[in-house]
Amino acid sequence: MRNDYLNLYYNCDSIAKIEYKKRDEKIDCEIDKYYLDGNHYNSKDKEKRYKIEQKEICKQFEVIKKHSNNKATPEKKAQSKLVLLNNENEDSNWFCIDVEYVKSFNNRVEKKEADFNGRFDIIALSKMKPHKVALIELKYGSGAIGGTSGICKHIEDFSKFCEKGYFEGQLKQEIIE
């Protein structure tokens, strides 16, 4: 949960945004239409997101699951399996608390000025005190090492994340809250 909403994930893919509207005393759900109809939409297309009743998400679960499975890459499937198996393992020293973490900004101007667009595959917290935080990037196959989301890019992102104080200033606080 972050910024008064939570993301519903399947295959480490954000399926829906779920938000409690205190003023209206109701839950709003918004889903990427791909998971309902299997059609890909332009990211700027206003038709891409769809308001949906929470009961409808449950009714459509098999359809959503099917489309997510079609979209999931081997890396995403491995990431999802790693998180699930780790968190089910009582003997693990770590507990995965978040997937696909993106630093939030107050607005687009702040985001542009920050010049930071990094994303971490998994955030894990050690079970033993003193607690430690692990920012995990998973790569699947040699083809995932180079390119725009390769190892070098993630090292740069991690360095920027630490240099700009995002770990101490925001992530730590989000974990505590």
Question: Locations of the language-model features?
Answer:
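Charged, terminal alpha-helix-loop-beta segments
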Residues: M1-E177
